[in-house]
Regions:
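Cytosolic regulatory regions built on CNB/CRP/Popeye-like sensor folds
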Residues: 1-152
């Protein structure tokens, strides 16, 4: 299967024209393979690459917590906080199985046509807004559950 075929239905590319998808797929970029258990991102690292999971699944974890924060599947984007803000990584991303991911670093991003860059940035803004909405909903449920319990 070609990279163009793999990215065809991925949400990040929903506002790309077919020509832009083809151009993106032909560009010289890093498609990386990871094995089950590999750390794709490590909490505290100062790397700023964005990743697009094109095959497989991974879990997001935080140091000091046993429960995964999120499950990523094909089509998921991760590393966006560091990519946009240049802050250190805030979590770990661990491969649940053998996966393929596209790595988008600053030099690759700079080579994209302005319309492609804008589409990616707009998608990341929408993604972050949706994640914030989900976290606010979860916090509201926790707060509702915690009412009536004394804080010691």
């Amino acid at each position: 299967m070609s990279l163009y075929e793999m990215i065809g239905d991925i949400p990040l590319f929903k506002n790309f024209s077919e020509e832009d998808k083809k151009a993106f797929a032909k560009m010289d970029h890093s498609v990386l393979a990871f094995s089950k258990g590999d750390a794709i991102i490590k909490e505290g690292e100062n790397y700023t690459s964005l990743f697009l999971l094109i095959r497989g699944s991974a879990q997001v974890t935080r140091k000091g917590y046993d429960t995964p924060v999120a499950l990523l599947k094909a089509g998921s984007v991760f590393g966006e906080i560091s990519f946009l803000t240049r802050r250190a990584r805030q979590s770990n991303v661990i491969a649940n199985e053998n996966i393929l991911a596209i790595k988008i670093d600053d030099s690759f991003f700079a080579k994209l046509e302005p319309a492609m860059r804008d589409n990616i940035k707009n998608y990341l803004i929408e993604l972050l807004a949706n994640r914030l909405d989900s976290m606010n909903e979860a916090l509201s449920k926790i707060a509702k559950y915690a009412r009536g319990y004394a804080v010691l």
